[in-house]
Amino acid sequence: MTTSFYFLLMALGLLLYVCQSSFGNQHTRNSDTPKYRCGSDIPNSYMDLCFRKRNDAGKKRGQASPLWQRGGSLSMLKARAKRNEAFHLQRAHRGVVEHCCYRPCSNAEFKKFCG
């Protein structure tokens, strides 16, 4: 009887652990939680949030990007976008640093700076 009680206790403990790890983290990390974006995070976020938005809009109109049609390298595209968009952010959107580097901003707030 003590052996079966021990195994039952272990099974319940394991079940509790699995339930806690599976369901306990659902509401702890939201993809749109505010975060600080400074330095190279600004062009990276711009590439992830704004370029995807532009590319999706082109797909909706049935106009895929010519770079994607030619099978352009994603790393080349990211490097060029970082170079071009970093300059664009410095000139046109000076407020993105004040808004998202000095205090945290969500993805929705960052998308307001998309050109």
UniProtKB/Swiss-Prot annotation:
It holds the Pfam family Insulin. Residues 1-24 form the signal peptide. Expressed by the venom gland. The modification Cysteine amide is found at residue 114. InterPro entries: Insulin-like (IPR016179), Insulin-like_sf (IPR036438), Insulin_CS (IPR022353). Its main location: secreted. Keywords: Amidation, Carbohydrate metabolism, Cleavage on pair of basic residues, Disulfide bond, Gamma-carboxyglutamic acid, Glucose metabolism, Hormone, Hydroxylation, Secreted, Signal, Toxin. GO terms for biological process: glucose metabolic process. It is found in: Secreted. It comes from the Eukaryota. Disulfide bonds join 38-101, 50-114, 100-105. One of its GO terms (molecular function) is hormone activity. Transmembrane segments: none annotated. PROSITE patterns: INSULIN (PS00262). Heterodimer of A and B chains; disulfide-linked. Is possibly an allelic variant of Con-Ins T1A (AC A0A0B5ADU4). Belongs to the insulin family. This is Con-Ins T1B.
